Amino acid sequence: PWILLLTTLMVALGTDGLVKSHPRWVDLRPIDSVVYAFLPALAVLGAGLFIDHAIESYARQGMAMAAAVTVGLAAFGEYQTVDPGGRLYGPFRIFMAVATYLVAFSFFTVIYSRDFDVPFAAAFVAGVSALLAMELLREDRIVGRSSLLVGIAIGLTLGEFRAALYFYPLDGLLAGALLLIAFYLATGIVHHILDRDLDLATAAEYVVVTAGAAAAVVAAKAIT
């Protein structure tokens, strides 16, 4: 485990240095650069835990290589998204949004599957959700204290949901999917609120997508 933690720390420090080397970087507060390191660092930790938990045999090497490429692209993406007017800003924001949800799923699955106490599992989910939400909220130019507060609010919501799942036994992958759906709903709604473009049609779209995905998970539970 210490090798995984050391690698996570090295990736976080490397991403921080990479971001600060950008010509457009302006260092205002320590948290401004720390947020950029969340996704690459958590990608390392989440991939390591998920591969150890869910992947077997020679598939582990392939998954590890794919995870390494993803982490490298995420770190490069953090550099490219320092400047919102940059040519590669849009494509990398999309890539990192997808990567964020994949990392969230890996953590949610592992945390649910492991035999952790409910308070610890809920706190773990809350912490991971808060950090990843702060990464997603960078698209709205929400940084500093505002980013932290909104991230904590989303994290607490997901932590409470993880605690509630204690009363509804699920397979780890299905529970991870449900938590991911909740994370998608929470971050999506907050994103539109911050952009001030949340209307009835958008809210209905999120409700339909969330309900459909949740129904699919429940159906999968019934089948298995």
Which role fits each region the language model picked out?
Residues 1-14, 56-71, 113-127, 169-182:
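Structural signature of hydrophobic alpha-helical transmembrane segments
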Residues 1-39, 46-50:
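An N-terminal, globular interaction/scaffold subdomain
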Residues 14-29, 73-87, 130-144, 187-197:
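C-terminal ends of transmembrane helices
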Residues 37-101:
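Hydrophobic alpha-helical segments and helix pairs
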Residues 39-51, 100-115, 124-143, 161-169:
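Membrane-helix boundary elements
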Residues 40-41, 154-158, 175-189:
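Hydrophobic alpha-helical membrane segments
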Residues 165-177, 194-202, 224:
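Extracellular/periplasmic helix-loop-helix junctions in multi-pass membrane proteins
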Residues 202-223:
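Final/C-terminal transmembrane alpha-helix of multipass membrane proteins
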